Amino acid sequence: MKDLPARRLLLVHAHPDDESINNGATMARYAAEGAHVTLVTCTLGEEGEVIPPALARLTADRDDALGPHRVGELAAAMRELGVDDHRFLGGAGRYRDSGMMGAEQNGRPGSFWSTSVDEAAAHLVEVIREVRPQVLVTYDPDGGYGHPDHIQAHRVAMRAADLAADPAYGSDAPHTVAKVYWNRVERAAAEAGFERLRTTAPGAFPGIASVDDVPGVTDREHITAEIDGSAYAGAKSAAMRAHATQIAVDGPFFALSNDLGQPLLTTECYQLVRGVPGVPEGERESDLFAGLPPATDGTGAAGAPSATGAANPADAEGGAA
């Protein structure tokens, strides 16, 4: 791939729809601003539940056709966000959705959870060295809420960032990602969103979720970047609607298959865990590329320091492997 824009953003997610819920406004904003946005999705989401009754036959325990259907949903969502570069890790269907933690699907041959981290990371290294992103976004060590595929996506993304920077690994030119972020949701913002839901649309869904049900929710001191995506609220909402088997959207609120309403947030928050902050200590970045040269090739310096001050990136992620 040649002649890419100066700014290049890579996002690594577990299933189709995760990108739109977590980063839809961010992706739409950077795509509109001319950055090259690459999404890597690790599975097809075959084990998901299905909201529309007319599509109930797609589930894994019936026709087992949900994965291919969600490929189409993801393509539609990417059109809404203006993102042209989407890949499935290792190719579509290479790794299967592992189901929720403790499910028998966790250990199924070919499931993402049962796959060696280094094996899966090798495919992501290829993408990193091809696209040469300055910024990588993925989950925290818990995957946001403990789903095995989210945890594995975190491990694979962090490992791939290490391997891609290692000149001794593989034959392609190494590349160091300058900044690595984890998805976060500020607790206070989530609480305010739930209060709006309770006061303005209490009957929009059969029930209302709790703040602690929101993946990646954390206190304000862990938030280092805040992306204002309000101008792209429509694009994010449309992308989420495209994932119709998984998400029901009602104005500024949505629900998953559990029918529990929650706020659709267009200010998206992140925690910088590798790289140098682009703002003074105590301030929040408003741009994930803050502090980077405007036309860098993104190679960065080997062993870019962790924003948490950890010499070993594993220390910054709670020792996750």
Curated annotation (Swiss-Prot):
Superkingdom of source: Bacteria
GO biological process, one term: mycothiol biosynthetic process
EC assignment: 3.5.1.103
Bias-annotated ranges (Low complexity): 290-321
Keyword Hydrolase: yes
A Pfam family that the UniProt record links to this protein: PIG-L
Alphabetical list of Gene3D superfamilies matching this protein: LmbE-like (3.40.50.10320)
GO molecular function per UniProt: N-acetylglucosaminylinositol deacetylase activity; zinc ion binding
UniProt: Zn(2+) binding residues: H15, D18, H150
Keyword Flavoprotein set for record: no
Annotated stretches, region: Disordered: 280-321
Purpose of the protein: Catalyzes the deacetylation of 1D-myo-inositol 2-acetamido-2-deoxy-alpha-D-glucopyranoside (GlcNAc-Ins) in the mycothiol biosynthesis pathway.
PANTHER family associated with the record: 1D-MYO-INOSITOL 2-ACETAMIDO-2-DEOXY-ALPHA-D-GLUCOPYRANOSIDE DEACETYLASE (PTHR12993:SF26), N-ACETYLGLUCOSAMINYL-PHOSPHATIDYLINOSITOL DE-N-ACETYLASE-RELATED (PTHR12993)
Sequence similarity: Belongs to the MshB deacetylase family.
Matching HAMAP family: MshB (MF_01696)
Protein name: 1D-myo-inositol 2-acetamido-2-deoxy-alpha-D-glucopyranoside deacetylase
Encoding gene, per UniProt annotation: mshB
